Every structure is written in C-alpha cells, then in structure tokens.
C-alpha cells in the first residue's frame, strides 16, 4: 500500500485531475442544478423553466435553430441525440457519392476533419507548443533575430521552448514515476474491493458503505476512497477514476517526451492533406463517432438532448438540430482543421457554433481569424470555452480568441465556468478568467448530460460544459426571436447576465473578489433574463446591421 508521504502526494496529484477529468455528481446537488432558478430553488442555475414559462405565456412561436458542435466526435446513435441531429438533405446516405458537390462524401450529419479517406481516424495528437518549438528550433536555437518580423518569430520560439522544456529539473519524470506507482497500488486495492463487493464496477459511495472485515480490506478501502474523494468524488465508478488517472499520466508522459523528441505526425499520417495549405480542404471522412466521442457527446447533450422524455437529462433548447463536426483530438487541435470546421458549419447553415476546446499556441491564427470573420459576415455566433487552467487570459494565451491583429471580433463570446455554493463555490476552481477577455460565467461543474457507448448519462465538469450551456441559451433566444443578429445575440447573453453582488473566489489566487473583477460583465448567464432582453431588442426599430469587419483594436494577435 502507499505509505503516508506517497498518500499525501497522491491526494494532491488527484486534486490536479479536477482540471482535466470528470467531477462527480454530489448527492446534495440535483442533476439538473444548472437549469434551476436561483430565486426559487437556491441553486445557481440559469432559470431555464422560467424562460419556457415566459415564452408560453407570451405565446411565442418557435423556429428551429441549427447549432454546430466542433468537438471530439458525437455518439450519433444515442437515444437523446439521434432525434435532434442535423440531416443534410442534399446528401444520399451511404452511396459513396458527394451528392451536394461540397467536397465531402456522405456528410449526412456533419464531417470529421481528422479522419482519413481509408476510414482511419486521428485519436491522439501532440501539443501545439511542441509542434511550434521543433519547427523553429533549427532556425533559431543559438541565434539572434535582427528584423522586427524575426524578433516576433523568435519570441514565439522562446515561449514555446519555455513551455516544452520548462525548468527541466526532472520533476516531470519523478511525477510520472510516482503516478504509475500510485496506479499500480490503486489497481491492487480495486481488485480487492471488486472481490468483496461482488461486482467489477462500483461507485465510491458503494465502497464507502461496505463494512470492512479485515485489516487488509480496511487499508485498501481507506487508500482508494481517500484519493477518490479528492480526485473527483465518490459518485464516479472505480473504472472512471482509474481511467482518468491513466489518461492524465499519459498526458504528462507526452509532455515529458516532447522535451527530447520531435512530435509524432499523428494527423498527417492519416488525413493525407497538405497541412500547410489551407485551400486543400477536401479531406477527412464522415465517421463522427470515431474513437473519442465522450467530450463532444456530452456537450451536444447539454445543448439539445431531447427534453421531457424522462430519459437522462434535458437539453437547454427544445427546437434545435445539432451539426456534428469532429476536429479536436486527444491533444491539441490544428488551426487548419478548426478554420475548415468553422467554414463548413457556416456554409451548411449553422447559426451558432459551440467550441469547447483551446490551446496556448496558434501558429496559423490568421486562418482561424479569417474563418471567424467569415462567420460574422454570415451572421453566425461563436461560443468558446475560456479554458481550465485557473489562469487570467487577459495576460496569458487561450486560442481561438476574438483578438485580431487589426481589431476584434464581435461575434464571439468567451465563457468561464460557474458552480454552486453546495458544489464547491460560485466560481469553478479550475476556470480561466479575465476582466477583459472572459465575457460571462455559466454553469460548468457537475453538469449531467449524455455519454457515449449505449444511451449512457453522467456528469462532467469544465468550461467545456459552460460553453454549450451558453450556446443552448443562445439557441433558445434564436428559436423565439429568429431575426436577432449574431452581435445582438451576444448582447442579449451579456446584458442579461445576472450581476453578482456576492464575492466569489478568484480561481487562481483564491482571493475573494467580485465577479466583475474576473469577467467583463460580472454576471452569471440567465435564460429567463435573456429572453426578456431579447424581446426588448426585437421590438426596437433599429435597422439590423451585420458587421463584416472589426470595430475595436485588440491588444495582442
């Protein structure tokens, strides 16, 4: 068993997992807490039913809205998602022909930009920091820049070098070694607990209720549950917890390997396109499930899982179609794939795009920026997760973002994650923040939604979950007020956010601050207030203008 010192380390490291893996649903928090009304229930939700009641009382007509989810893949066979999937009516399923001549064969429900024509799919990928570092290493290692252009590239090289190499004090290797030891000990304890509980899969709560009969059982139970409590909570299963630890260890190994070895060309070995040519767009396949659908399936369900069917949980919006676009691997996404995914969504009629991904390097940022501009020109709102590093994104990097070299996007909203007092606090401990660059906070802790692999459901946490909450509210607004522009829709979400007078935790410093100190609006999103604000905007006689360019100069490109 793990000795006392290692147990302390294990608990600390397990706590680190909270930023990367699942959060367990705590018993005292309802599964749908994020949708509840704060005034009547005491939970810091978005007053969703109150919004529906208002729409009903006003006899508002609902028009179907198309939301694209750019993510890791979606379980298109899930009982709560299959009925709401977008269907490309111009494409004949399974005939192997590009019927609509858009360059993508059999894109019936969407497209997979990280797949090959031979049916293979990109599952894992390297980190962008490593890709940038090794691309520029030969050019700049041991050299000094002269021109302004060279100095900018050199600065990016040094930033990537610091990210990849760091202090290189051996701490990463020792952490990995310890985690592998912890994994071995956890598996031993798990084997014993499986035996005494009489089942292969059990929750922490079930293990907690078991009365041990031997000292060995007592030690195994104490060690396993002690770490599990700090690594997600006792509602998760033994397999979910151990798998999360294994995945986290693997991510650290990938980062450690990058210190000495160039990244593997995971993507180009499968997709077959010219990665450096944005115009080479006709690549990928139509496999939307692929091998990494957990994240995307959960996000899609948050937005639009079939409501009121008494299965699992209800989505935010009840008249939405989901367009599935796979562009995010286990690792960092490529700018080309994100740019093409945005353009695909826009060209096929998406009105809102949910983007629960991000990275701290973007070597082809102009490709993504141009795609965001293109979306603006077609009146499409983009909703983006702020990230899970508990960092201030006013002073650090999180891409994509609305900051362009020559201005600022007006059709992109950035979302931080909120919680509940009964669930760890009003702000999520992992959420990125920023007085200038995070627009609003939305529920992102223990969000119950769809999971892949046979009509499953469960809780996950992250700004990745807060993002589709906002996308779902935006879709609900557009259902009832379809003439709203993307800019107006962004205004509705932001201006209707409920400003918090209560001090909250700064996710990074843990200081008590006002929400307005760590976000632009200082507010939590609220569907009911948003619907009221949308009504005001729709009743104005101000001409609708869709901005095609940027109106405010940004501070970093």
Outline where the language-model segments fall:
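A cross-family glycoside hydrolase active-site/sugar-binding cleft signature
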Residues: 326, 354-358, 385-386, 416-417, ...
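Extracellular S/T/G-rich loop segment that most often corresponds to the catalytic His/Ser-adjacent loop
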Residues: 380, 401-479, 483, 487, ...
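Subtilisin-like serine protease catalytic core
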Residues: 53-67, 74-274, 278-334, 408-411, ...
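Mature extracellular/periplasmic domains of secretome proteins
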Residues: 52-61, 290-293, 314-317, 332-354, ...
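C-terminal subdomain of the subtilisin-like protease fold in secreted/lumenal serine endopeptidases
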Residues: 346-348, 352-355, 364-366, 411-414, ...
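Active-site glycine-centered loops adjacent to acidic/histidine catalytic or metal-binding residues
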Residues: 71, 387, 462
């Amino acid at each position: 068993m793990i000795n006392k010192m290692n147990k302390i380390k294990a608990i600390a490291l397990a706590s680190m997992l909270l930023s990367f893996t699942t959060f367990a649903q705590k018993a005292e928090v309802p599964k749908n807490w994020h949708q509840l009304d704060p005034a009547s229930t005491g939970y810091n939700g978005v007053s969703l039913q109150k919004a529906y009641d208002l729409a009903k009382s006003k006899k508002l007509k609902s028009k179907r809205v198309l939301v694209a989810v750019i993510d890791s893949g979606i379980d298109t066979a899930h009982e709560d998602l299959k009925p709401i999937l977008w269907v490309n009516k111009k494409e004949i399923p399974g005939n192997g022909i590009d019927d609509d001549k858009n360059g993508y064969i059999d894109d019936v429900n969407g497209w997979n930009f990280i797949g090959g024509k031979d049916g293979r799919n990109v599952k894992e990928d390297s980190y962008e920091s490593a890709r940038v570092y090794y691309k520029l290493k030969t050019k700049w290692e041991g050299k000094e820049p002269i021109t302004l252009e060279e100095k900018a590239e050199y600065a990016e090289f040094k930033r990537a070098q610091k990210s990849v190499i760091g202090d290189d004090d051996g701490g990463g290797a020792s952490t990995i070694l310890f985690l592998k030891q912890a994994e071995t000990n956890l598996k031993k304890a798990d084997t014993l607990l499986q035996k005494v509980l009489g089942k292969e899969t059990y929750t922490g709560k079930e293990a907690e209720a078991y009365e041990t009969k031997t000292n060995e059982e007592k030690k195994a139970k104490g060690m396993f549950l002690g770490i599990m409590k700090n690594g997600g909570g006792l509602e998760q299963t033994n397999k979910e917890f151990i798998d999360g630890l294994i995945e986290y260890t693997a991510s650290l190994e990938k980062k450690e390997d990058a210190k000495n070895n160039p990244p593997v060309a995971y993507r180009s070995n499968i997709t077959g396109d010219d990665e450096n040519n944005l115009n080479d767009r006709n690549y990928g396949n139509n496999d939307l499930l692929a091998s990494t659908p957990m994240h995307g399936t959960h996000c899609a369900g948050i937005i639009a899982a079939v409501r009121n069917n008494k299965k699992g949980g209800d989505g935010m919006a009840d008249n939405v179609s989901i367009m599935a676009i796979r562009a995010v691997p286990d690792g960092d996404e490529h700018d080309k794939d994100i740019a093409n995914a945005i353009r695909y969504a826009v060209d096929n009629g998406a009105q809102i795009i949910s983007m629960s991904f991000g990275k701290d390097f973007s070597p082809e940022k102009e490709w993504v920026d141009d795609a965001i501009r293109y979306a603006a020109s077609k009146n499409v709102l983009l909703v983006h997760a702020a990230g899970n590093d508990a960092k201030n994104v006013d002073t650090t990097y999180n891409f994509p973002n609305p900051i362009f070299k020559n201005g600022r996007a007006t059709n992109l909203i950035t979302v931080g994650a909120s919680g509940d007092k009964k669930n760890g606090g009003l702000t999520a401990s992992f959420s990125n923040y920023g007085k200038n660059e995070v627009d609003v906070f939305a529920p992102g802790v223990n969000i119950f939604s769809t999971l892949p692999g046979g009509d499953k459901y469960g809780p996950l946490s992250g700004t990745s979950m807060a993002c589709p909450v906002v996308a779902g509210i935006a879709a609900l607004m557009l259902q009832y007020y379809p003439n709203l522009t993307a800019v107006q829709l962004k205004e509705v979400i932001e201006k209707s956010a409920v400003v918090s007078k209560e001090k909250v935790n700064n996710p990074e410093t843990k200081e008590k601050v006002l929400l307005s100190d760590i976000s632009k609006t200082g507010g939590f999103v609220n569907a009911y207030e948003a619907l009221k604000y949308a009504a005001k905007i729709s009743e104005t006689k101000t001409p609708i203008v869709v901005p095609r360019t940027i109106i405010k100069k940004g501070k970093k490109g």
